Amino acid sequence: MITDLFLRGDRSAVIANIKRAATEGRFNDKVETNDPVLDLSQERALEANYLRMRKKPAFWLNSHLELALIGTTASVDTRHVRVVGRDNLAGVTGGAVVTSNHFSPGENLMVRKAARGRSLQIVGQLTNLEMGGFLGYLMTYGTLPISSDAKYMGREFPKLLGGSLQKGNWVLIYPEQEMWFQYRRPRPPKRGAYYYAARFNVPVVSCFVTMRDTGVHLTGDFNRIEYTLHILKTLRPDPKLSVRDNSLAMMQADYAQKCELYETTYGEAIDAPFSAADIVGWHARG
């Protein structure tokens, strides 16, 4: 699996950052050690270039090619990933916001397996557009980029997201924001995903990936892992509530059902102290 590729190399510094942040209750902190950082002028240059690209006919062609390539990759790569709860998708016929836990650069392929036959775009950091090679190609044409630029986020991003949802696409937004490598617990979500679902009046397709350490060595630091993607109860905006109240209600309901699944699967309270087992497959070093 592609996710196995990311289990190689020394992740001890990242895991130490996760432990520190979890122990201190900072569940949305950035923990990766080598993420690129852009200043505002660099962000605006990337935004402008991306928006120019979207207006060209080649962008439409490449977007459809990216969808075909990533769909084929997901089908092959996730053939051993179990998906449960498809019955919870009954009645989801158009655009939707998808939420899931963010623990690996490759876990979105599992969400694509759940989407099966639906176009899925991913909301990701603007820095992804600077990647080169095949991965950079996928990021450019399969991602809706977000930025710290308030003007872009207030004007351009809602247009991009709303347009995608209106076309019937699913859009994956990570409410946990930052990736915590191989971390198994659901983390308290931020409101953005649910705000956009309420604003554009689309359902929230709630996903959560559970992981099982097989005990079979894969790398020097990690065992091979089995993954199960759970599709939980779909959440829908209440027409009697405001956008703000809807977003808060769906955020709380989504986190609650993810926590319930976690506690049922792992037999541990969501607020138990951090342990090495929280980083699934990792061989803790003394």
Stretches found by the model and what they are:
Residues M1-L38, P158-G286:
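Non-catalytic C-terminal accessory region of glycerolipid acyltransferases
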Residues F59-N62, V123-G124, A150-K151, Q182-R184:
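A generic secondary-structure micro-motif detector
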Residues G71-T72, T140-S148, E176-M179:
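Short, basic, glycine/proline-bearing loop/turn elements
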Residues R79, S104, A150-R155, P186-R187:
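A conditional alpha-helix N-cap/helix-loop micro-motif detector
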Residues V83-R86, M131, R155-P158:
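Structural motif corresponding to alpha-helix initiation and N-cap regions
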Residues V92-K151:
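Catalytic core of membrane glycerolipid acyltransferases/transacylases, capturing the structured
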